[in-house]
Amino acid sequence: YCFGIDVGGTTVKLGLFSTAGELLDKWEITTRTENFGENILSDICEAMEAKLAEKGISLDDIEGVGIGLPGPITNDGTVLQCVNLGWGTFNVEEKLSEMFRGIKVKAGNDANVAALGEAWQGGGKDYDDIVMITLGTGVGGGVIINGKILTGYNGGAGEIGHMHVDDNETDSCNCGRKGCLEQFTSATGVVRLAKRLMNNTDKETKMREFGENITAKDVFDLAKEGDAGANEVVETMGTYLGTAMSHIAVVVNPQAFIIGGGVSKAGQFLIDAIKDKYRETCFAACGDAAVHLATLGNDAGMYGAAAMICK
């Protein structure tokens, strides 16, 4: 057996897996971020101990624990900073292993780990080389080459949400710079584009009925119904993302792009909007990359964490 753990800013998702990759049980605990997140690892250990007791499984039968975290992780398991958890710099693999009776621990960045999950058991399982793009509140990414996470020199590989895509942008991204991909293709980015269209044009669109409360889902739903304004927003978003993918493709030449995160619930409609622009802008040798939806949903991080141990 092994544990796959996905630590988010509000909840920790835990999964007990067979080493063959079957999810046997999954559950959640609250992420206690107070006091610089000092309780998070002990809460995880308690949750794992309780599950072993409940299932009658000995710790000797556990191959290890994989853990995905919201921040850059170096190749030796050092967390550089997890702002969402209140953590500074320390070696999370050593610390968790020490707390959980010396068990093997592997840690990775959450977006990279989710990509590994999709590559192992999800939308990318037919491929060795994939790029996963997660469109949520922000935009995350993960690059899998020959079945392994490409982390780069100090864990920064795959941070595609912060690719610079627009010189004319005046709003700042969360990272402090202007013109990042995340500002145009995340759920918040789609809403921003919609509000900009409503505020700066007289275009007739049902988006106006939602006013300030419009969501990315509303935009995609209206676009599917043929609303011209919503379609313009989706087309703009697809142009930014498809073009960014063509830039990524000439560097890593993946067999497939896997699109996940909340925005991907728009389904094939979203894929079509991206794919056309990707094909139009990418170098010919990279043009046949498949573009698929992720299939593991919120469980991708758990699967990927388990894959770091079992795969």
Enumerate the predicted regions with their spans.
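Short hydrophobic alpha-helix segments
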Residues: W27-I29, V83, Y153
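Short beta-strand segments
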Residues: D6, G66-P70, G108, M132-G138, ...
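Gly/Ser/Thr-rich active-site cleft segment
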Residues: G64-N91
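Adenylate-forming
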Residues: A114-W120, G141-V143, H162-M163
